């Protein structure tokens, strides 16, 4: 009766507090072991989610969830149980100008942002250091990055052409 909001599940994530999060085609679902709570955007301008098609859930070092939808990101703060859709302002504070097409949080809680037509940014929250890896500076091959993941040597950038670039964790090259 109180199951998932959609049978199309795009991502499953367990946060540091033990909640299970299900990114579905019809909202974000949180399971606490007993009940399912569904977050949907009934008004796309004011609701918690920019879009109901939720694609990915990740947790940063401050225990905030970065939620990717078909229309952009929102950040869920578990302390206040509130959503913040102004991701641009948060990134601006870190020195990043642009809206991320992709965000990846690695095992060390470092944050990788892909900004279309610009490149990637590695942000290390612990030291508040920002490393731009930009197309026009020749630091990355130009193209559209469709996924960011991790391997034993570093971080993988997957391009829409099928090209895969591995960035060394220590040198970011």
Predicted region positions:
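Carboxylate-rich, polar loop motifs that coordinate divalent cations or form catalytic acidic clusters
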Residues: 1-173
